[in-house]
Regions:
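A conserved regulatory-domain signal marking ACT and ACT-like small-molecule sensing domains
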Residues: 1-148
């Protein structure tokens, strides 16, 4: 199931990330996964949150620079298990002509296993191929249930 991602541009200086996280915390929005890409003068923060629409609204109201071009990005979240190692998942996607644009892991653990967030060039096809290969993909509701 596709999972919505929130992306925010931040000035690259101490405390910028803390400001974003504090704003989400004050509004009781949980963060399930987070990554930061250094872009020189600024950073790009990508997050999976408990309520992406609310997180977007709260951050926009606080004048954070949300990545407009990445506003409605959805990602795949796969469960890494004994049978579904990262190597198997990336091989399945690559053999089917799918490119992984970026990946990051989730802070949510599922009975000792972790989730991997994947941005691929064709999400619908990736989800279908992963299902056909019996790879467990997670929805936002699945993540919420395991985080509680």
């Amino acid at each position: 199931m596709p999972v919505p991602q929130v992306s925010v541009f931040l000035d690259n200086h101490p405390g910028s990330l803390a400001d974003v996280i504090e704003k989400l915390d004050k509004n009781e929005i949980k963060i399930y996964a987070l990554t930061i890409a250094d872009k020189g003068e600024f950073g790009l923060v990508r997050m999976i949150t408990e309520d992406p629409a609310k997180a977007t609204r709260v951050l926009e109201e606080a004048d954070f620079n949300l990545a407009k071009a990445r506003r409605n990005i959805e990602v795949a979240v796969v469960l890494i298990t004994d049978k579904d190692h990262i190597s198997r998942i990336t091989k399945i996607l690559g053999q089917n002509g799918l490119n992984i644009d970026y990946a990051y892991s989730s802070a949510v653990h599922f009975e000792g296993k972790f989730a991997l967030v994947l941005r691929v060039n064709d999400l619908e096809q990736a989800e279908r191929i992963l299902r056909e290969n019996n790879v467990d993909t997670l929805s936002l509701d699945d993540i919420k249930r395991h985080f509680a």
